[in-house]
């Protein structure tokens, strides 16, 4: 029988919100477990590991990969329990007001409080609805860009008009032989400046969509685009195709748990990031509230606020927030260690 180990807090989702909350929960002496669906931590940043991030406070321009590594290092400061490759699909409130969370295989996690840091749910890329397209996925049909240099000196077609498609088009224009963008609408998502830049450095076809892929073996060599209104067709030769048609979101378990949602399907939360169910808190992209900052910095603030909410939920007499880290006794030994490491570095 599975051993029933009870945690103070179980965090669902290992993106920026979940990772920072894991660290902060350690600062608040909570016994914490982090459960992530992917086999790797990092959340959405895993979609842009090579992109440079500029807008996280106090952090000089840093790649997504470096930020993930730093977040993971910080999250593991207090030795939390981390479970990867587990999709939480059900939350049950027990008569003693604790929660049991079940993963897809039926494994249970026992916890006194829950934090939903599940972003937009399990992202499932919208695939091309063209028969046989999947055979090119092993070679030059991509649904995300995790490594820029594989597109160096290539003729790349990007299909899609969202934020990510615009960003990738601009970045690839610096290294690829040619970047062509097709989109079924004339308008593109993302910052106006980025869209303008994309228009000046790539060839754009709107309103067009991919109608046919032509390949030999497992590689696409050309693509037929069709005009969305007239059906007029044009063929272009390519070395790689990137499709970014958005993601299907799996938010079903939030609905099944009976949590109050805003109209757009995201979680309604109180000022201390508690959901409509006592003991279930939330942080990051999964929440909506007035003043929402849907950025990594916003996820950090919401994470710390939610952990403080959890602490007071479990112990109403607890301080409202953790004692500042610069003067926190918890770090005394670690600070000594850091000083010694720095001195040793200077000596070498
Ligand atoms: C292309 C792109 C570029 C961006 N650039 C920037 C930028 O420059 N600066 C910036 O501040 N922000 C940027 N963002 C936004 C930023 O990435 C998000 O705001 C941030 O990742 C939100 O963090 P999160 O932890 O709330 O959610 P996520 O990062 O989405 O993480 C949620 C995690 O929860 C997991 N999960 C979900 N449901 C379950 C479940 N049921 N069971 C187990 N695990 C589950 C998911 O697998 C995922 O790992 C960008 C976003 C994109 C898409």
UniProtKB/Swiss-Prot annotation:
Q: Which UniProt keywords apply?
A: FAD, Flavoprotein, NADP, Oxidoreductase
- Cystine pairs: none
User: Sorted alphabetically, which Pfam families does this protein's record hold?
Assistant: Pyr_redox_2
So which domain of life are we looking at? Answer: Bacteria
Start and end residues of each stretch annotated as Disordered? 329-348
EC number of this enzyme: 1.18.1.2
Where, by residue number, does FAD bind?
A: 36, 44, 48, 88, 123, 285, 326
GO molecular function list: ferredoxin-NADP+ reductase activity; flavin adenine dinucleotide binding; NADP binding
Comment on bound cofactor: Binds 1 FAD per subunit.
Cofactor(s) of this protein: FAD
Spans through the membrane: none
Can you state which reaction this protein catalyses? 2 reduced [2Fe-2S]-[ferredoxin] + NADP(+) + H(+) = 2 oxidized [2Fe-2S]-[ferredoxin] + NADPH
Quaternary context = Homodimer.
Q: Which PANTHER family match?
A: THIOREDOXIN REDUCTASE 1-RELATED-RELATED
Can you tell me which family this protein belongs to? Belongs to the ferredoxin--NADP reductase type 2 family.
Mind telling me what this protein is named?
A: Ferredoxin--NADP reductase 1
């Amino acid at each position: 029988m599975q051993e029933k180990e009870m945690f103070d807090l179980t965090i669902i989702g290992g993106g920026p919100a979940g990772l920072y909350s894991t660290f902060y929960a350690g600062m608040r002496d909570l016994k914490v477990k982090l459960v992530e669906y992917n086999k790797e931590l990092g959340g959405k940043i895993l979609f842009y590991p090579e992109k440079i991030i500029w807008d996280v406070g106090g952090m000089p321009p840093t790649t997504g990969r470096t930020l993930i590594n730093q977040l993971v290092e910080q999250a593991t400061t207090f030795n939390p329990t981390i479970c990867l490759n587990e999709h939480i699909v059900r939350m049950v409130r027990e008569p003693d007001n604790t929660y049991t969370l079940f993963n897809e295989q039926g494994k249970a996690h026992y916890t006194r409080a829950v934090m939903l840091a599940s972003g937009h749910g399990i992202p499932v890329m919208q695939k091309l609805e063209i028969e046989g397209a999947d055979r090119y996925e092993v070679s030059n049909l991509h649904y995300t860009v995790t490594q820029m240099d594989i597109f160096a000196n290539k003729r790349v077609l990007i299909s899609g008009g969202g934020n990510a498609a615009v960003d990738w088009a601009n970045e690839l224009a610096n290294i690829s032989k040619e970047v062509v963008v097709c989109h079924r609408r004339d308008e593109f998502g993302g910052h106006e400046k980025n869209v303008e830049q994309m228009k000046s450095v790539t060839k754009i076809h709107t309103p067009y969509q991919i109608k046919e892929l032509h390949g030999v073996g497992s590689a696409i060599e050309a693509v037929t685009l069709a005009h969305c209104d007239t059906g007029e067709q044009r063929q272009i030769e390519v070395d790689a195709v990137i499709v970014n048609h958005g993601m299907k979101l799996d938010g079903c378990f939030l609905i099944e748990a009976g949590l109050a949602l805003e109209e757009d399907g995201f979680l309604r939360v109180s000022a201390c990031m508690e959901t409509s169910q006592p003991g279930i808190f939330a942080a990051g992209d999964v929440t909506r509230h007035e003043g929402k900052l849907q950025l990594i910095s916003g996820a950090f603030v919401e994470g710390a606020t939610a952990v403080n909410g959890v602490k007071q939920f479990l112990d109403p007499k607890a301080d409202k927030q953790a004692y500042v880290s610069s003067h926190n006794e918890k770090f005394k030994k670690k600070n000594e260690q850091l000083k010694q490491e720095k001195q040793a570095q200077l000596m070498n």
